[in-house]
Regions:
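Juxtamembrane interface helix immediately N-terminal to a transmembrane segment
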Residues: 2-23
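Alpha-helical transmembrane spans of integral membrane proteins, capturing the lipid-embedded, hydrophobic core
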Residues: 16, 20-24, 58, 62, ...
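Membrane-helix interface motif
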Residues: 28-41
Length: 453
């Protein structure tokens, strides 16, 4: 039974009203300062009075600027909370990315060129969402790898070789990533992108079925016009750490596993190497937000929504009731219930309502060890097709292949959007317990397997 607690939306409404009052008061005071300055005449104000008026106006602008997203974030939280209570989904209606124009590309190219000169390391022109690229030949890619089969500590995996020579579009840039291996949080990545629909099939990693989105270094890609012509860039000096030319495709397979003492065989993949392939990044550093907005990863609308919710939560935590959005309740039980639906790819299912899922969660927001993340709430009440069953996966911290006793389900087109995780671009597949789903209709015979974006 879910423990009873005060309704969070009441505290949220108080914060919205208070922030709106502060913002309105700031607007009225700012209007008064401006009118007084205009009526008095600029020449009649002493330097001290002018400085005080200017400082006051600036402070009022800051107050209004902080109050506005707080109110907007609170209203979004209240609306979504009502939808969750009614079991109605609110998934993203369109892609969050946009295509940067020539001006953005030129400015970013200049900054990148300056960085290359200062660091002494050649860097290609950046890739952006919607760019059409061709994956370099395997021979070209192998020349960029060090003896560990990595570039900037990011492995090129054998599963990626199948796409060499193919044309694909860039989904988004990966300038930051969440480190779930060491728990160090948000980390900075460079010169890395996702390509549309290219996910790891786990063929060379023990049949891992988590369908992680493959990470591609820009050095492994080249722009193409779409008519078979690619735009090769000057190679420049060899990349630091480039391996011996004798490095072969078979070496990639050899580097997939390693043996470490009592732990036995451990798999090496891009997700196990996230910490090594990235650098620490402060959550309070605003530059990663600017990169998201200016370089095409997040359109203005989703950006405003995400930042407003974050601002609302910060105000709520410091000045309000402390109850943040989104909220989940749990049963508090030590063990969680289980249900077997034997779902198969192609089955149509409905994600259960929030209050139904809450009854299946232990104190750690888990069911049989699988965490129900707040990113998943937006899909509650929606109908989706099953894309895959997951009963084998690589545990990222240990690198060991695990057979899952309670299979998980991946739904077609249902991925983490990163709105509550500072717009993290990983586009992870979301794993679902069968007890969180209900079958709507079985899969038609001979229906082709669906793929995630």
């Amino acid at each position: 039974m879910i423990a009873q607690r005060p309704r969070p939306d009441r505290g949220w409404l108080v914060t919205v009203v208070a922030a709106a009052a502060v913002g309105l008061g700031g607007v009225l005071m700012l209007r008064g300062v401006v009118l007084r300055a205009l009526s008095g005449g600029a020449g009649r104000l002493s330097p001290g009075a002018g400085l005080a008026a200017g400082t006051g106006a600036l402070l009022l602008l800051v107050v209004v600027g902080l109050a506005t997203p707080t109110v907007l974030g609170g209203l979004i939280a209240l609306r979504r909370h009502r939808l969750e209570a009614r079991g109605r989904p609110y998934p993203p209606r369109q892609r969050r990315e946009w295509k940067p124009g020539l001006a953005v590309r030129a400015v970013h190219g200049g900054i990148r060129s300056a960085g290359a000169i200062l660091s002494g390391r050649p860097r290609r022109r950046a890739l952006f969402p919607f760019d059409l690229v061709e994956v370099c030949s395997l021979e070209e890619i192998l020349k960029t790898l060090d003896p560990r089969g990595t570039l900037d500590a990011l492995p090129f995996m054998p599963e990626m070789a199948a796409y060499c020579g193919e044309e694909h579009r860039v989904l988004r840039r990966v300038d930051k990533i969440n480190d779930y291996v060491t728990g160090s949080g948000l980390r900075r990545m460079r010169d890395t992108v996702l390509l549309e629909r290219l996910r790891c099939d786990g063929q060379h990693h023990g049949g891992c079925q988590t369908c992680c989105h493959l990470l591609w270094k820009e050095a492994w890609l080249k722009r193409t016009s779409g008519n078979g012509r690619s735009f090769a860039e000057p190679d420049g000096p060899p990349l630091p750490g480039s391996c011996d030319p004798a490095f072969r495709e078979g070496d990639l397979q050899r580097l997939v596993t390693r043996v470490e003492g009592y732990r036995g065989v451990q798999y090496v993949c891009q997700m196990t190497e996230v910490a090594r392939a990235s650098a620490r990044l402060s959550w309070n550093d605003p530059r990663h937000y600017l990169r998201d907005l200016l370089l095409g990863n997040v359109r203005l609308g989703p950006f405003v929504v995400g930042v407003s919710i974050e601002m609302f939560n910060r105000v709520q935590k410091r000045f309000g009731s402390g109850v943040l959005y989104p909220q989940l309740a749990t049963t508090g039980l030590a063990t969680s219930p289980h249900q077997v639906l034997d779902l198969q790819p192609g089955d149509v299912v409905r994600v259960r309502a929030k209050h139904e899922i809450e009854r299946t969660l232990t104190a750690g927001y888990r069911n049989r060890g699988l965490w129900f993340d707040t990113e998943m709430l937006r899909f509650c009440g929606g109908e989706y097709r099953v894309s895959a069953r997951v009963d084998r996966l690589i545990e990222e911290k240990s690198g060991q292949l695990i057979t899952v006793g309670n299979p998980c389900i991946i739904l077609d087109g249902v991925t983490a959007c990163g709105e509550y995780k500072v717009f993290c671009p990983q586009n992870e597949s979301i794993l679902w317990r069968e007890i969180w789903l209900e079958r709507v209709s079985p899969a038609p015979r001979d229906e082709p397997r669906l793929t995630l974006q």
